From Swiss-Prot:
Record carries keyword Chloroplast: no
Listed InterPro entries: Ribosomal_Su5_D2-typ_SF, Ribosomal_uS9, Ribosomal_uS9_bac/plastid, Ribosomal_uS9_CS, Ribsml_uS5_D2-typ_fold_subgr
MF GO annotations: RNA binding; structural constituent of ribosome
Pfam annotation, one family: Ribosomal_S9
Keyword Ribosomal protein: yes
Organism ancestry: Bacteria, Pseudomonadati, Pseudomonadota, Betaproteobacteria, Burkholderiales
GO-annotated biological processes: translation
Keywords: Ribonucleoprotein, Ribosomal protein
GO CC annotation: cytosolic small ribosomal subunit
Protein name, per record: Small ribosomal subunit protein uS9
Similarity comment: Belongs to the universal ribosomal protein uS9 family.
Source organism superkingdom: Bacteria
């Protein structure tokens, strides 16, 4: 807890989100913009709001987020992870509910590196018999 803000760090792919929550009226600000202006896809907005809807805290908190790296989906996942951790910092009794939904666990899948002699990570060069 920093002042009257509860804090959580979320990560997904190469995105990192620093999330601060405090009691308020439900405003979510991402990198200085309202959430609807920052995320263009409806699915990204749904992903971010999942932990709040699950715990029935949709309009209970004002949320301030700084997110860097990655694309839109990775950033949305990082924000969700950060909100989950901040909610657990606020109230530890929410952990079993959030854990059961799979929001506490960090999604460890990362981009596989490109290998030498391949076009992409696994796509080989076309084989020619002759």
């Amino acid at each position: 807890m920093i002042g009257n803000w509860n804090y959580g760090t979320g990560r997904r792919k190469s995105a990192v989100a620093r999330v601060f929550i405090k009691a308020g009226k439900g405003d979510i600000v991402v990198n200085g913009k309202p959430i609807a202006d920052y995320f263009s896809r409806e699915t990204s907005l749904m992903i971010v709001r999942q932990p709040l809807e699950l715990t029935n805290h949709g309009v209970t908190f004002d949320i301030k987020v700084n997110v860097t790296g990655g694309g839109e989906t990775g950033q949305a996942g990082a924000v969700r992870h950060g909100i989950t951790r901040a909610l657990m910092d606020y109230d530890a009794t929410l952990k079993p509910e959030l854990s059961k939904a799979g929001f506490v666990t960090r999604d460890a899948r990362e981009v596989e590196r490109k290998k030498v002699g391949f076009h992409k990570a696994r796509r080989r060069k076309q084989f020619s018999k002759r």
